[in-house]
Amino acid sequence: MCGIVGYIGYDNAKELLLKGLEKLEYRGYDSAGIAVVNDDNTTVFKEKGRIAELRKVADSSDFDGPVGIGHTRWATHGVPNHENSHPHQSSNGRFTLVHNGVIENYEELKGEYLQGVSFISETDTEVIVQLVEYFSNQGLSTEEAFTKVVSLLHGSYALGLLDAEDKDTIYVAKNKSPLLLGVGEGFNVIASDALAMLQVTSEYKEIHDHEIVIVKKDEVIIKDADGNVVERDSYIAEIDASDAEKGVYAHYMLKEIHEQPAVMRRIIQEYQDAEGNLKIDQDIINDVKEADRIYVIAAGTSYHAGLVGKEFLEKWAGVPTEVHVASEFVYNMPLLSEKPLFVYISQSGETADSRAVLVETNKLGHKSLTITNVAGSTLSREADHTLLLHAGPEIAVASTKAYTAQIAVLSILSQIVAKEHGREADIDLLRELAKVTTAIEAIVDDAPIMEQIATDFLETTRNAFFIGRTIDYNVSLEGALKLKEISYIQAEGFAGGELKHGTIALIEEGTPVVGLATQEKVNLSIRGNVKEVVARGAHPCIISMEGLEKEGDTYVIPHVHELLTPLVSVVTLQLISYYAALHRDLDVDKPRNLAKSVTVE
């Protein structure tokens, strides 16, 4: 949620900042702004709405300079409007600030230090910048004032501060909110993620929580909470900028659906040794082997992937596994086993709720593993181990290729641990994943069929239901989430056997019901459930698998191993959801009220 960019160097900053913000659009936002500094002045441009509107305003002015900060805002304190947009300035105009996160004690700070100060916005951010001015007026240097203010803040924040009387510096701090430092020759940048500033550098340094960073064009000084200078190596962000472009596709979501076969091949390659055997780090294997129970912590689509992963971990590896919603777990932790292993699944590696759980389990000394798409992300840094998805940048808000990548990686982990436990495999996983890849390609080629299904079943409906049994039920949850995320159709996923326990009361004439029928032992049962809703006027869509199909099924996916069917059947639901939104003329990649990375609790 939200995004920050900053530049200090020799080039004019305005265009670099605007392009950087455009690369952060996928994170979700409702307003955007930049502040640019030159020898004469600090000028702020900000607008409610899309960055295209901000660009019009900024481009209408000739003002530019070699230093600046930018921000995309997702409203938390105060409605989306011009006044609440970032950057914010102090009363005397000397200090300018951008901020991601939520300050929990801003009202207390406002009451204690800022009595009589006139505020323009409703935001917690303006309190921060006014506090910097307050302590500056008490005689503190800008660095001292900034450090003092940061020490008072409770909550999450990533901060970038400009001082009109010190035009050669950006002051930076973070806690529980992502922010990176980009390194260049004669310039430096800050960004919420590396993608934003790949236009100028691929070399980055991490910023850790509670650190103060003094950024100048020719040097960077990192200080810990005690004021000690910290030396830190840089790393190269292994991202191809072209991976973040739509290319020939109309939308990022469609591109990312089509990329799934390539992602599967990349995962097979990355997790295979020279002899053609599955491989992961031995330390990870040892910790999973020693665990008497695995607790999967995730949110949204990653949670649904975790539900599928539970099937692998229990059926193949023989490890009891629980899957928990991160935002609930952190406040309602169950009784834990003696030797738990926590597995955190997050596409971005920045999910605030999951990180909150990780902080608590780290305090308890429990082992942890992060499954993420982003090397160097907060979860990957703070967990004991990391397994990467190798899916490439996922820009569309609605996750597609990350979901299938998460399931594939979980299947590999489970099979390796099964072997370590001496459990006989009933599957040649690499061969089966290759079959899955071919099956996904076939479904992607059938995209026109999915478009017709979407048109027939979902274009004008008010609600829709997805039903399945066993592992198909887990996929039905993800199918419903995809549809509601981007088409704004009220959609719910249910276990087929639960229909008679309340849900069937919602069925009326023409209600679309998508039934997944890819599991042999429950094939007749789920078809019976479909007949029940048809008898009450529902409009059915049955997605089955070769070998289990019946006459009249809407679509039949190629045959794959039953436990791997989620990797294939979900692609049909992704495409159906995409075309349902497309035919409703909606913003597929940036649905309303949603953010790609949920970085506040």
Swiss-Prot record:
Domain SIS: 284-423, 453-591
Location, primary (coarse class): cytoplasm
Catalytic activity: D-fructose 6-phosphate + L-glutamine = D-glucosamine 6-phosphate + L-glutamate
GO MF annotations, alphabetized: carbohydrate derivative binding; glutamine-fructose-6-phosphate transaminase (isomerizing) activity
Leading EC class: transferase
Glutamine amidotransferase type-2 domain sequence ranges: 2-218
Active site: 2, 596
Superkingdom of the source species: Bacteria
GO terms (BP aspect): carbohydrate metabolic process; fructose 6-phosphate metabolic process; protein N-linked glycosylation; UDP-N-acetylglucosamine metabolic process
Matching InterPro entries: GATase_2_dom (IPR017932), GFAT (IPR005855), GFAT_N (IPR047084), GlmS/AgaS_SIS (IPR035466), GlmS/FrlB_SIS (IPR035490), Ntn_hydrolases_N (IPR029055), SIS_dom (IPR001347), SIS_dom_sf (IPR046348)
Keywords: Aminotransferase, Cytoplasm, Glutamine amidotransferase, Repeat, Transferase
EC number, UniProt record: 2.6.1.16
GO cellular component: cytosol
Record's keyword annotation contains RNA-binding: no
Record's subcellular location: Cytoplasm
Self-association state and partner proteins as the record states: Homodimer.
NCBIfam families: glmS (TIGR01135), PRK00331.1 (NF001484)
Function description: Catalyzes the first step in hexosamine metabolism, converting fructose-6P into glucosamine-6P using glutamine as a nitrogen source.
HAMAP family: GlmS
Protein name: Glutamine--fructose-6-phosphate aminotransferase [isomerizing]
Species: Staphylococcus aureus (strain MRSA252)
Gene designation per UniProt: glmS
